[in-house]
Amino acid sequence: MAQIVIVPAIVTTASVLPFAAELASQLERNDAIELDLAAVTDADVSFLQLVCAARRQAEHDGKTLRLAHPVHAELTALLERAGFLTDIPSADQTFWFHGDLPR
């Protein structure tokens, strides 16, 4: 069973360090992590970079990092602005959206 990690409402460059430490700690202690992004109201590219790095590290370590639910509209807009949706690989599409891109 995956350990659920509630992502804080604000995850920006100014506030990402405590969440990064928590995520690293959870990945060290658990084989499967599920991120709950429902509370996120303010995020920037540092959040996306952290999640991508954690996902790669989890894969490298034979662990699983996934999202509890597909990203909501605000995070979809952030992914778009940051260029993550341009020619998105299917594995990334599955990770962020659990399948099809939103329209």
Regions found by a protein language model. Give the residues of each.
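STAS-like cytosolic regulatory interaction modules
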Residues: 1-43, 52-103
